[in-house]
Amino acid sequence: MTPTRVGAQIVEPAVFRVLVEMETRKAQRMRYVVSLVSLGVDEGGTSPAALAQRVAPAIRATDAVAMQTGDSVTMLLVDAEDTNLPTIMERLTPGLEDISWSAGGACYPKTAATADELLNQAERMREQAKRQGGRRLSLPH
């Protein structure tokens, strides 16, 4: 009997991009939402691989995490409203206490109309959180 995997699957960036595109198409057809959170380390201290290992167990097995260039990861959160993102980040924060981080979120179709917009918006929001001092989640208004 295979043990049940706990937490999100960590995938390569190219696979992640395909997953985001597929989920936004499914979300449009099935009328649900898809959110992304871009989480970055502001002052070194951990690699994207280590960051992915920290966050993956704290999110659902139906979600995905990808290491990005630089010191960041992006989380695909299926059927998670943008209003749920602060609660999700609260769940992740205990595993991030020893590093300086910034996060940005976006939600399809609420704040972004395409997969590209979703990815870009999450990145922009992360940069905004970093400019505001870090250790926070920034969301579009």
Task: Name every feature range the model reports, one short phrase each.
Residues 22-29, 48-82, 94-99:
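Conserved helix-loop-beta segment at the catalytic/binding core of cyclic-nucleotide signaling proteins
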Residues 1-12, 25, 32:
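Amphipathic HAMP/coiled-coil signal-transducing linker helices
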Residues 97-102, 121-141:
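Catalytic/regulatory signature loops of cyclic-dinucleotide turnover enzymes
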Residues 16-43:
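Active-site-proximal structural segments of metal-dependent nucleotidyl cyclase/transferase enzymes
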Residues 42-44, 76-85, 100-125:
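Catalytic strand-loop-helix junctions within cyclic-nucleotide turnover domains
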Residues 1-5, 70-71, 139-140:
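Catalytic core of bacterial cyclic-dinucleotide metallophosphodiesterases
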Residues 32-34, 63, 101, 135:
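PAS-family sensory domain
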Residues 16, 20, 37, 48, ...:
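Heptad-repeat coiled-coil signal-transmission/dimerization helices
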